[in-house]
């Protein structure tokens, strides 16, 4: 289970960092994997920081910070709790594809579409089509392998925690187990988590803490070379032609095309079921161990040093991984003699399945044994001196911290080819005498380090006037020694107006009013290391050979990298400005928060483009430089209401919405003109561009009239002779671009990409909102979250609108109503597809024309989703006392229900994921929490 988290909009032009936040677990920096591996029952609370509030964490906090505090022990008798959860995950939706009969009909209509060339009258063509008797038989066939192989995946989670302690020491311990199945094929994932910690008061002025945590995860799945992973398997099953079974009478069948080819490729021989049921396997084991400790001394015993504390902390993390793989050659079969009058069917009463009718083939599923091991070690040390003290109405605090962190990572990979059929996965179980036998070993290693100094001063007067100044200095070894260090200051201030004596809360009905502002500078080092120095690599061949013996046929050469060197590359800078207002009304029942932010990215990593700046004669690619500039800005509004009705009923609602945008000030501008290229001082979202569709050619007369009326000479690279009914009609908008004047000529009779128009001013939704609400009555409660986004249009996915007829691939169900110029006949002169000139969709034969981006495929990008909803009930405590239980709560939760689907015929939806890829999932869980 993983979480994709975005706190602030991305403002990068280059570099290699993804716009993900920094994760901090119990005060120590952690990676996203450690965050995802946390068990929910280990977590006490999660806090999100952004803008200047995140500046204390330096360069890595440019996209915000997720602070996680895990559970700690509390003073009291031992308290034991159990949490159990059972659930299942399923696809938000599966793509709707053509059934067997419609596939055959659409295939025929597309295959015989070029009526101008009289292909329809060709006997050779008619034999290659599905015959009428075959189509009739296909009405009873529908081998939907995606529907067959896809299933809801079960999950379960169990955890047991214990906590307690005295004034001297508190403790917490917990262990949890999580298990998840896959939605497609054979997949099993198991993970154990453990965490134990103790906080001890060594003396009145000294305390220490120690925490040990870790997890062990194991994944088992089939070795699958040709499937291409989860996404590849999903696409393969989705596109499987629905009249071909994957197995008959225990034989794994592969589709050999309309002509029953005898020399198929491994991709054509691929059979998902055969791979899933083979012994080929991938086993992955991952272990993570963390040790955190701290020692704090309080100078509260001194009248003059009271408020001063010194804290030393240390964190050590070790992660190891091991993967074992085995891939063999799997037997699959081609049906030599197929059924139907055209010889295209795989199932029928007249078909036999035996050694004479089945041809045996081998599917190469890797044919190798593999081992890989990796290990990463990291540590973080902090020494922090803090001071906080109240002097009357004056509150002063300060902090100085030194942080040092280092990490190293290495892996080792080995493989052997040609495992023996009876292999148990041992290295000796291979045929080293086989032709092409190979043994390979590779290894990699990397290391990194950071050193930081942090200083912060806070002052407040009467809790009304709040001020903070912070300075952080970071060093990164990614830069040349003279550029290691970056200095990043920040300032913030706040004023609680509602605490002023002159502020009348009764008259204004405002219980709380605060204004705040902040300004800070953050930096990033998101470039590859060693860009500042010249590096060389060794090429084992292509070198000269002088004076060696006749058996020497290779010689090593020294090779320069593909990218240039830039010794001046240094920290980039983001100037972050934030202004906010916090309010509470009507006896604090209503709240409002308004935030404005403006971020100016300067000296950002970017690369110049175009031969005018970097001629081809240089011979290498330009290195990143610090010249990019981008401004990102936005506003966020939050409105909340909470109240009680009577003694036992309460409810709350919170609405959050916002808007964000950006302007590109400087980057590596494209030399050639392009409609959607970045433009100085305009947003990076260039909108959606494509042709203006003005109809569909439904006859040759319409084609002639169009070419004559607009004096068309070229239509997407085609002359009139190659334009046919069933193609979309695009408008000739303008002529060619004149670089000298920066303008376009008038319509020139050539329809090409120069005729693009702006289909949508936005390619992604600029507006969004979230509605959270909840209700409780005694021991019963409901909470939910709705989300929506709007403000843009999108296009039907390229892979969906550019689908073409293929004897090996099915197509979306939307093509069921496809243009057919005239009746299509089989070899017996029987109509297999009736004329359909009033169809909604063009003919997929011409996907290169019809699949181009155009207004024909324009759909709304708006989304509305029920992101999650939980119904909970706590059993009355008087019932539980009898059996010694302090509390018991049941909850039912479901995630992600979508309401809008603008896609044609509902065949797919944007909220379901990318067409042809593993879909987004919804989840339902039933849980119970018991405390003793």
Regions found by a protein language model. Name each.
Residues 270, 274-277, 344, 789-889, ...:
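Extracytoplasmic gating/loop element in the C-terminal half of outer-membrane beta-barrel translocons
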Residues 23, 459, 745, 775:
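Short aromatic-centered micro-motifs
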Residues 1-22, 28, 35, 53-296, ...:
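Membrane-proximal, glycine/serine-rich, low-complexity loop/turn segments characteristic
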